[in-house]
Amino acid sequence: MSFVQIRHISSQINRKTVSIVGSGPSGFYTAYHLLKKSPIPLNVTIWEKLPVPFGLSRYGVAPDHPEVKNCEETFTTCAEEFSSPTNQKHKFSFVGGITIGKEILLKELLDNQDAVILSYGCTGDRKLNIPGELGTKGVFSSREFVNWYNGHPDFAKDKRFTDFDWSKVSKVGIIGNGNVALDITRVLISNQIDEIWENTDISSLALNLLRRAPVKDVKLIARRDFVHSKFTNKELRELWELEKYGIRGRIDPKFFQKEMFDPSKYDRAFNRRVEMCSEYLKPFNERSKKNYKKAPPPSSGYDKFWELDYLKTPLKINKDDFGAINSLSLCNNQLNEDNSLQPLKDVNNIMTYKVDLLITSLGYAGVPMPEFSKLSIGFDKDHIANKQGRVLTSSGEIFPHLYASGWIRKGSQGVIASTMQDAFEVGDRVIQDLVVSGALSLENSIDLSNIKHTTWKDWERINKNELLRGKKEHKTRSKFLTFEELWNGVEGI
Amino acid sequence: MLKIVTRAGHTARISNIAAHLLRTSPSLLTRTTTTTRFLPFSTSSFLNHGHLKKPKPGEELKITFILKDGSQKTYEVCEGETILDIAQGHNLDMEGACGGSCACSTCHVIVDPDYYDALPEPEDDENDMLDLAYGLTETSRLGCQIKMSKDIDGIRVALPQMTRNVNNNDFS
């Protein structure tokens, strides 16, 4: 283990100091933009609470979407270039394993740095707030479930997952209609198709448990209707295309028929979604376009199903004598013309779905840092109060030198590319302010000599070791699954 | 003349700028503008991440980029290079967040209608990403999916003013 002190000894170049909290796509794209665009020399430090970088790219993106993680290559090139002593203009440091607000206070960063950017993402779960949501075996939030199969050290060996009896999971309910809900559907319905998963960086521990589940039916349950589904066409198409494995998608005609949607009233993306669904719902040989006939279902037919289910409100999670989920009570919703939603709770509108596993995928919630109230930093419901990235105090004034980018700035919406654009825009404002502000001092430093942490070099070793382990297991990467393994991974396997 | 596909009514203005640029500067094919980067200390290989081959004499293909500030740049390139490779090799402001694997829309370009039909039709996966592109037009494509060929020698593409990926939910 290396304990490198990062006290920045001032050289001839007077660099302004910038600290970024969080090393996911928003934090790293902000750093990248600053280092690429700033006309004045900068000393940029990214702080990450885990010993390893990349946040949701590493622990959120589905294992079968490795191309989405390619942004990590840009971050790596950026880190290597500016960590190198030969680069005379800017300087970059990564500090992992340190939580801002714990080992080092946000106040300390604010006192020491010329600018601080909060890019720590959305770390909480939105809840259903219904009976049985907490404490029932087999009920997980999407954040927990995704972190678990992606090998996040907080969840990879969590007993709630490892002690759960996966061999009884045949029917699954997923509440929510975003891309995360589709990712989870894909993982669960194709859990036994090894060619999809075995070479990916999915946690082997999770995959082995998931494989035991004889999943037959996955219902994606939404409060609103087909028009309001939030997932994107790419992810939906991936689900339809699983039909070559005998996995069939369904939508009840009362929720979807092509004729319900007048193309002139909708945008291109939605009209393409309507065409996709109406074509895929037809029997294979009756489809009109060749792109919906890429690979036929197996001759044995379909034996697993996923279904888009609409206009329902979950009311109660029911459990068996052992505390495991066995069903979900719901009611129908009425969607009014003004777009308001009305749950219909009379006896004719209440139903029960038998489910063996329930994932709530209602979106990630932004959480304020513990020091916010003391420092009078504003927080609006699920994101930091800000004006174009400049953080506001609780009374609405600009908080000097403090910025926010990514999901914690705007809430948990959008793909990596939108986060990137947001990071660039906030980065431009930081540069704008830094160019005109006087430097705080020449010797801004935070002494890390007595605090255990990882550096970029340490991450390079962990990375190398994970790739090496992966090679032995015929996977792209085999992640270290606990904090202990990660810290030890700096040294060797 | 470019038709603008209006997505939720928010994108027309930005698309118009690029469309206007393509319309109003047809004779500027050979004009190149140089922009200077302010790098007082050292030049950085980090900014130069493309790996472009030099075309053999007589086999050069031309491409013109219309940049966000309205300036134009023309390059001579090899057959087979993608527009994303070319833009990155010349330090133009085009990201390829997914590394050119058609999994994001950060390399969205607006193709001159005169060249659009000469391109092979976009596949579903490209269209799925274009659905999310900001400032989408009827001649929008992803730079990573267009390879230079003799058929499109002289192609002109505009970089949209913004590359932010949006979906309907961003506006709700």
Curated annotation (Swiss-Prot), chain B:
Residues 1-16 form a transit peptide. It holds the Pfam family Fer2. Its cofactor is [2Fe-2S] cluster. Binds 1 [2Fe-2S] cluster. The keyword Calcium does not apply. GO terms for biological process: electron transport chain; heme A biosynthetic process; iron-sulfur cluster assembly; P450-containing electron transport chain; ubiquinone biosynthetic process. One of its GO terms (cellular component) is iron-sulfur cluster assembly complex. It is found in: Mitochondrion matrix. Keywords: 2Fe-2S, Electron transport, Iron, Iron-sulfur, Metal-binding, Mitochondrion, Transit peptide, Transport. InterPro entries: 2Fe-2S_ferredoxin-like_sf, 2Fe-2S_ferredoxin-type, Adrenodoxin-like, Adrenodoxin_Fe-S_BS, Beta-grasp_dom_sf. It comes from the Eukaryota. Residues 61-163 form the 2Fe-2S ferredoxin-type domain. The keyword Mitochondrion applies. [2Fe-2S] cluster binds at residues 98, 104, 107, 144. Belongs to the adrenodoxin/putidaredoxin family. Interacts in its reduced state with the apo form of ISU1. Present with 14800 molecules/cell in log phase SD medium. Iron-sulfur protein that transfers electrons in a wide variety of metabolic reactions. Involved in heme A biosynthesis and in iron-sulfur cluster assembly. Transfers electrons from adrenodoxin reductase ARH1 to heme A synthase COX15, a heme protein that catalyzes the conversion of heme O to heme A. Required for the de novo synthesis of Fe-S clusters on iron sulfur cluster assembly protein ISU1. Interact in its reduced state with ISU1 to productively deliver electrons for Fe-S cluster synthesis. Essential for coenzyme Q biosynthesis. This is Adrenodoxin homolog, mitochondrial.
